[in-house]
């Protein structure tokens, strides 16, 4: 019975497809784990919606994943983590629930040497102040500078990862953060890890914190601690569920995932 518990999947969810960067990191860090992903592509973006609506949509996704008997959940969406994280944890009880903000904040504090941390994220995540709160809970003396970088999302989805337009946009967003002397930068949006090489060149003396990688590390640590790591599965099952299959979804999704998406299924929630 214990082994069956370990074989249960990890549930990962996002408001769209950006969370596939988290799935990619989990596949690389935990190659024997079964994974179920849900992206609410019919109702993205969440950032423009009210707190009550975001909580309602999130609860529907959590119910869906609980119906698939997941052993842990990863909130692979900064907006959901900032707005509905507490409510999700109340609903799931003792189940391990990881999120990109908590993991990113923890990694940033472990990385910085001068106690000056920058965050680039979407408008909603910046306005929520969730990263600063998470960092200041552990170290109130840390300087946290946030910068909304909304234009990077469509550029990533367009595939312009090394385009001059993207480079210039990154430079503009980095200017105020670099002027404040940050030595650590959190990539606070699930799209941004794809721009890590470009951002690294433009902020070459700054350590980059990839929330997807740090969340995968934290997931591995918690599963091991709870005795839930699957160590005997050489043929893991990956399932991808979405609420809509928009134009170019597979192309963009596979760019985020770094491999082909074989099992995509559309489901309707709510």
Swiss-Prot record:
InterPro entries for this protein: Asp/Glu/hydantoin_racemase, Asp/Glu_race, Asp/Glu_racemase_AS_2, Glu_race
A GO biological process held by the record: regulation of cell shape
UniProt KW keywords: Cell shape, Cell wall biogenesis/degradation, Isomerase, Peptidoglycan synthesis
One example GO MF annotation: glutamate racemase activity
PROSITE patterns membership: ASP_GLU_RACEMASE_2
Substrates-to-products reaction catalysed: L-glutamate = D-glutamate
Functional pathway: Cell wall biogenesis; peptidoglycan biosynthesis
Keyword Lyase: no
Positions annotated as active site in the UniProt record: 77 (proton donor/acceptor), 189 (proton donor/acceptor)
Pfam families with a match to the protein in the record: Asp_Glu_race (PF01177)
Coiled-coil region list: none
The enzyme's E.C. designation: 5.1.1.3
Residues annotated as binding substrate: 14-15, 46-47, 78-79, 190-191
HAMAP family xref list: Glu_racemase
Family indicated by similarity: Belongs to the aspartate/glutamate racemases family.
Job description of the protein: Provides the (R)-glutamate required for cell wall biosynthesis.
Entry-linked PANTHER family: GLUTAMATE RACEMASE (PTHR21198:SF2)
The protein's name in its UniProt record: Glutamate racemase
Organism, scientific name: Neisseria gonorrhoeae (strain ATCC 700825 / FA 1090)
Gene that this polypeptide is encoded by: murI
């Amino acid at each position: 019975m214990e082994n069956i518990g370990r074989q249960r999947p990890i549930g990962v969810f996002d408001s769209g497809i950006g969370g596939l960067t988290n799935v990619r990191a989990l596949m690389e860090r935990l190659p024997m784990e079964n994974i179920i992903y849900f992206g609410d592509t019919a109702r993205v973006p969440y950032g423009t919606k009210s707190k009550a609506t975001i909580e309602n949509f999130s609860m529907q996704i959590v119910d869906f994943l609980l119906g698939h008997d997941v052993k842990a959940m990863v909130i692979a969406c900064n907006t959901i983590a900032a707005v509905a994280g507490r409510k999700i944890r109340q609903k799931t009880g003792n189940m391990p629930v990881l999120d990109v903000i908590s993991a990113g904040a923890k990694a940033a504090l472990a990385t910085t040497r001068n106690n000056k941390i920058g965050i680039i994220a979407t408008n909603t995540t910046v306005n929520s102040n969730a990263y600063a709160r998470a960092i200041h809970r552990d170290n109130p003396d840390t300087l946290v500078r946030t910068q909304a970088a909304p234009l990077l999302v469509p550029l990533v989805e367009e595939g312009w990862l090394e385009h001059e337009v993207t480079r210039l946009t990154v430079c503009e967003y980095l200017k105020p953060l670099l002027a404040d002397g940050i030595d650590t930068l959190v990539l606070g949006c699930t799209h941004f890890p794809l721009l890590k090489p470009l951002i690294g060149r433009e902020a070459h003396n700054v350590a980059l914190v990839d929330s997807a990688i740090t969340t995968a590390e934290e997931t591995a640590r918690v599963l091991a601690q709870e005795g839930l790591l699957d160590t005997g599965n050489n043929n893991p099952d990956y399932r991808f569920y979405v609420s809509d299959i928009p134009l170019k979804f597979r192309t963009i999704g596979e760019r985020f995932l770094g491999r082909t998406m074989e099992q995509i299924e559309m489901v309707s929630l709510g």
